[in-house]
Amino acid sequence: MAASARIILPAIWLGLIIGISLIEAPLKFTAPGITIPLGLGIGRLVFGVMNWVELVIAVILLWSLLKSGVDRVYRSVACGLIGVLITKVVVIRPLLNQRTDAVLAGVDEGGSSLHLLYIAADGLLIVGLVAALVMAVRRWVLIRPAVAADDR
């Protein structure tokens, strides 16, 4: 399970970020009839659920790392990913929620650079997840022939 988890979990996590952050979020505001308050409300719901799913993936990934031997570089990348995720959920999201509360209450016009922090965090996650996937797939490809040779 641990070797496959090192490939499957980052792939799912990467797909989640690409699908929601890079595709759904920008497109949502181009749909007919979507107002800023409606888009912000949808965004809070979608990103809240996405962050919970990301946290579950991160916990399972961490568990798989603790359960099996993995090289130090992969472990460092995975821990970095978890650190970025925690920062995104614990620091950036609450600030964005305060900001969207103000916009939804009509107190603020919007236009904050806080979304750029969230985008930057997702950018770091994308780079880290691709790196983790490359390392895991390379290791899997190198180990598989050796295992197959042992079976002969």
Features from the language model and the residues they span:
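Interfacial segments of alpha-helical transmembrane regions
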Residues: M1-L14, I60, S64-G83
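Interfacial loop at the N-terminal end of multi-pass membrane proteins
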Residues: M1-V59, P94-D108, S112, D151
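Transmembrane alpha-helical segments in integral membrane proteins
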Residues: P10, A58-V70, V127-I143
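Alpha-helical transmembrane segments
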Residues: I17, S21, L85-I92, I126, ...
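Short amphipathic alpha-helical segments with coiled-coil-like heptad repeat character
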Residues: T35-L38, L104-A105, A120-A132
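Hydrophobic alpha-helical transmembrane segments
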Residues: V49-V56, H115-V130
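Mid-chain, well-packed structural core segment of small domains
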Residues: K67-V107
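Short, highly charged, low-complexity non-transmembrane loops/tails of multi-pass membrane proteins
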Residues: R144-R152
